[in-house]
Amino acid sequence: MILPAMSSLSRQYNKLCDRPDFDDPALRAMLRDIVAPGYAPEEELRRKFWEYAMLGLYLEESGALRDDAEVLSIAAGHEEPLYWLANRVGRVVATDIYGEGGFAVDGREADASMLTDPGHWAPYDYRADHLEVRSMDALNVDYPDNSFDVVFSLSSIEHFGQPEAIRRAAAEMARVVKPGGHLVIVTEVLVKAHPLDWAPLQVAIKTLSRGKRLDRATMRKRMMDAFRPRELQRDVIAPTGLAPVQPIDYTLSPSTYDNLITWVGDDMRPASGNEYPHILLKGHGSPWTSAFLAFRKPA
């Protein structure tokens, strides 16, 4: 089989989620193919759906959607791409710490029922015999080197804890990719520099407020689980030992800021007053959004 050259990719994949991306008919079509039916067009304007569509477009263009392909999802939850891929490749393995931690409560992504009844979460009919679900820690992937044609993780690695844990998870993902195979990591990136993103300053605020503000900040980790570009390079990209298939485009269009959503406690306050587009969010410092990173292991 001749593998497509990554230099000839038809679009910029390694980039931030940007409002004009949703104006692309191919992205919209892929989005609608992957997510559950029934969303109004304006409800599709969300960064999670962008992540799904970009994954589908990249795997389609790179020739990875094959009957003999084996795919591993890290911190998979019960997201739609698992079921979509089960209908298109030979084997999908979904892994997560199902039933453990904050993402396992109230029907959230790591609900324990995924281990025994993944069909409960399926957005449409899928080939159940093509999807396996395992409880597994992303820091210790229980597969030999070079096991999977595709490994992917969507907006999860930023939640793995201290930088050392994040680096180990990135290295583990790359380790189990077959030569010539693909690694996709989507994570969350701070789009501007802001003094409040400096962890020691957040700790000072936490101390002065007696823990009422920025209560999870530490000297080594800010409150918001998102990366500055240099942290992304250091803690996610470099530990894979792989080169991204393209340079990363960190630019955003002005229209992406039109509905900046500010997170205040448990409330989300969109600038326009409308829930969508749900693309760019702001907590304590810089705004942040999703970043798509695709890598290929040398054959």
Predicted regions and their residues:
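A short glycine-rich, Lys/Arg-flanked "PGG" loop and its adjoining helix->strand segment in the class I
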Residues: 167-182
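Class I SAM-dependent methyltransferase SAM/SAH-binding core
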Residues: 72-73, 79-140
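Nucleotide donor/acceptor-binding cores
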Residues: 66-70
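A C-terminal cap/extension of S-adenosyl-L-methionine-dependent methyltransferases
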Residues: 245-299
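A short acidic, Gly/Pro-enriched loop at the edge of an enzyme's catalytic core
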Residues: 136-151
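Conserved class I S-adenosyl-L-methionine
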Residues: 182-230
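A short SAM/SAH-binding and catalytic strip from SAM-dependent methyltransferases
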Residues: 149-164
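Class I SAM-dependent methyltransferase Rossmann-like catalytic core
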Residues: 5-65
